[in-house]
């Protein structure tokens, strides 16, 4: 476990996080699937009665040590029992059990903190939505933050056809075929709302603060939203991968992309070490000088000026 932790916080931790995504997909379709289907008195050889779309750090293959796992549950139009109302209840029951099993705290900890608030309609909507309901919602939505969230969308469970149908629905919502200059204004509004909330904090936040992780992600996502509809090379979920494509497409200078990549990797390393130390989701640099020194030493900085 220690060896895995040390390996994870090297400069390669973001590039190699595909294993984390695969592990979640295996767990979701493995033991958790069996429990969910058993509770529904269904054949264990069947798939889950819905597909799972990952967003956020899981969708982008960028998990850290204490990431929330943002998911959306979507089902196709295939019937389970022949009764639509009963099918809906079965799907909701399976979804609740899946969340409970994956979030359950045991002696070994828990698999994931699952966050379902990014689903269409948020907490006001059912846990599982049909593909048609999801498409109708996004067709009517004008919220930039939802387009940004779906940049990271990646199927992690469900039938291959459902996954394909979901992504075919998501892509046109995120990536517009015509250049939309309103993107700049809308992204700026989202950023300002985050900054207003962050200004209430007294401590330095490496995620939401000026020059932090979120600012780099917003910079990259703005290019994706502007040009991704006409340049499919930008339709990627990982921040580092998109930076490489921004170089290849000459949308930003190579040196600028390299500086952003270096800053992003450094801030993510700090994030990992903060969460290893605090054992919870933390993005705040400690105010204590002693704790700051301890954090710096854990990052490999040995010769620290004591003044």
Question: Predicted segment positions?
Answer:
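A nucleotide- and high-energy phosphate-metabolite-utilizing enzyme signature
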Residues: 1-20, 24-26, 31-307
């Amino acid at each position: 476990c220690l060896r895995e932790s040390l390996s994870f916080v090297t400069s390669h931790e973001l590039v190699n996080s595909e294993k984390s995504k695969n592990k979640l997909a295996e767990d979701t379709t493995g033991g958790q699937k069996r429990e969910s289907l058993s509770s529904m008195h269904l054949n264990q050889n069947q798939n889950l009665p819905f597909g799972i779309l990952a967003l956020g750090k899981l969708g982008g293959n960028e998990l850290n040590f204490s990431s929330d796992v943002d998911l959306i549950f979507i089902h196709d139009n295939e019937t389970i029992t022949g009764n639509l109302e009963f099918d809906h209840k079965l799907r909701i029951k399976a979804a609740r059990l899946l969340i409970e099993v994956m979030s359950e705290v045991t002696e070994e900890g828990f698999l994931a903190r699952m966050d379902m608030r990014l689903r269409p309609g948020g907490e006001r909507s059912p846990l599982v939505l049909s593909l048609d309901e999801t498409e109708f919602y996004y067709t009517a939505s004008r919220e930039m933050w939802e387009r940004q969230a779906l940049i990271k969308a990646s199927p992690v469970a469900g039938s291959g056809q459902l996954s394909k149908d979901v992504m075919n629905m998501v892509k046109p919502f995120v990536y517009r075929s015509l250049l939309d200059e309103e993107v700049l204004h809308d992204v700026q509004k989202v950023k300002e709302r985050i900054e207003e909330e962050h200004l209430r904090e007294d401590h330095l936040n490496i995620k939401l603060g000026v020059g932090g992780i979120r600012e780099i992600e917003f910079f990259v996502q703005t290019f994706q939203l502007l040009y991704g509809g006409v340049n499919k090379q930008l339709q990627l979920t990982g921040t580092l991968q998109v930076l490489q494509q921004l170089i290849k497409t000459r949308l930003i200078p190579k040196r600028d992309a390299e500086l952003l990549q270096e800053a992003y990797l450094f801030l993510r390393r700090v994030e990992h070490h903060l969460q290893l130390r605090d054992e919870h989701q933390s993005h705040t640099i400690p105010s204590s000088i002693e704790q700051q020194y301890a954090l710096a030493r854990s990052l490999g900085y040995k010769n620290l000026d004591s003044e």
